[in-house]
């Protein structure tokens, strides 16, 4: 944001993915996330503000409190994500499919923030296993994310329950016994395997073999007549 005005003027920026029928900001998909920045002017000519301690996933931004009529060059959206090089490309004869691929790449980058997030806009922004499991293959083929996933997988391994071998469903996160679900925790061995298939590096398997074995043994203790009980999260909608 580039702005000028009297000292003490308060500028508020609110972010959302949609607008209502009347043109007002629709923050429904933000859930409990405030998605709001407030900047107070010094009053010394043109000033520039950019968030340093947060990020926002949005399509629309509402600017409140400008002391002058706004100009298009006063506001700029900047893309922020983990610095991963583009390593894959896709072309075909169908512009619609190519457009879907471009949108997928943008969605993926928007959720690479040191770990694979579930969403960049609302009040979670967490490393849910289910989301990472269904997108890791695409991320590995489109971007140089082997180091990214190596770091994430190492965190999962270190955070494994030392008592019974169980694995949580979110990382990074301290382990808590929150009804772990194999349909989500199994992202751990799945993503390890995907990294190996893409890289051919057996170190992925060697590093995580023991932790994965302990996890499979844990699932065996939960099974009844070789059938695991119903867990709470399941496919969770689109994931």
Regions found by a protein language model. Give the residues of each.
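Extracellular/oxidizing-compartment recognition motifs
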Residues: 2-121, 130-131, 147-150, 164-174, ...
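Well-ordered alpha-helical scaffold segments within catalytic/enzyme domains
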Residues: 66, 134-145, 188-204
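Hydrophobic core segments within long, regular secondary-structure runs in both alpha-
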Residues: 98-101, 105, 146-157, 189, ...
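Residues at helix-coil transition
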Residues: 109, 157-158, 200
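Aromatic- and histidine-enriched alpha-helix N-cap/loop-to-helix transition segments
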Residues: 123-133, 144, 179-190, 207
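Tryptophan-centered motif/residue detector
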Residues: 128, 152, 184, 188, ...
